[in-house]
């Protein structure tokens, strides 16, 4: 590594980064961040896993809806995917205390084993509804560990000044996976059946595992190993409490999971089927349109040379995101609904990337795993939002569900701005 002097060119731990001479140059290439360390392996293992997960979400949502005709149970299959969120703080401590590469490989192997189990049940025609719920719940036990690992591995490999590019690429990958996964998953299910859809999902999980093996080993420092679990958890809570930005950022992580993400994490099957009479392919296309918008928003923020005031971007994006939900709730003609859905996804992509950039910039390297682990509890908002949204859809219809969640999001964003004004001024 070169010994460069500008502060912006250094990692959070003070070590200088590479390619400093290029910092001042602009580039529209979102993949330029792959030159940093082993991020060229961190990103592919995330991408392959996300493609598998997004196919799985749409395939299982359609399967449950057809088997039960219950929007509430569709919401439940999405919600149980995040049951393991409760262990987020513990996983954060694990990430700070153990070799992150070995943890990542272990997560991938476990995911492959579950996918093979479900595929076997499908092929042998022994799959029952409770099997799907049980296997998805088991997978949720490591899903949160996977998320924390990816975020910390990214922050380990990519210097602070380029972090927004990595987060933008990561978010674009998620939304790209939703575009491809929704279309491919829905189409495979319609044309070839549940068995071939899950065989494809299993192959993607296997490829993600192989890529994870290429990540550099990250032995932990001695001082991290000697910190007790309880002490480490208290340190994370104390740091969050004393920081003027983190409480508000963690609140927003819960809010958007509760109000916005349920629409593209299972409930799109209900929206497409009940409001616009779409089949599996049509539902997949609607989810893909929302994700294409989010991909564009995340990519736009990711290719910027620098991102100032990510908190302000997050707040303005949240207002726009939830206001568009009120327009979607009016159930306009399908062509206009898709246009609004694209804009909704675009504002969501910008909002999410800004939030994660602010979180990772604010959390120091030595406590990053603990802070992100505690932050992960906010993802319980998605489980609650899926159940709440599924219940509203069942009782009052999908349009009412979209409007209620959008109204809650707008109100909560306004309250957050009043409660944590530092978010709007953060650099």
At which residue positions do the language-model features occur?
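C-terminal transmembrane bundle of multi-pass solute transporters/carriers
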Residues: 75-77, 90, 97, 101-113, ...
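Transmembrane alpha-helix termini and helix-breaking/packing motifs in multi-pass membrane transporters
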Residues: 61-68, 119-124, 180-200, 274-275, ...
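Hydrophobic alpha-helical segments of secondary membrane carriers
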Residues: 45, 80, 169-177, 252, ...
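Flexible cytoplasmic inter-helical loops of multi-pass small-molecule transporters
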Residues: 14-27, 213-238, 427
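Core transmembrane helices of Major Facilitator Superfamily
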Residues: 138-150, 344-355
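Paired intracellular helix-loop junctions of major facilitator superfamily
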Residues: 155-163, 361-368
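Helix-loop boundary and gating motifs at the non-cytosolic
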Residues: 24-83, 238, 242-290
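Hydrophobic alpha-helical transmembrane segments
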Residues: 129-140, 144, 165-220, 288, ...
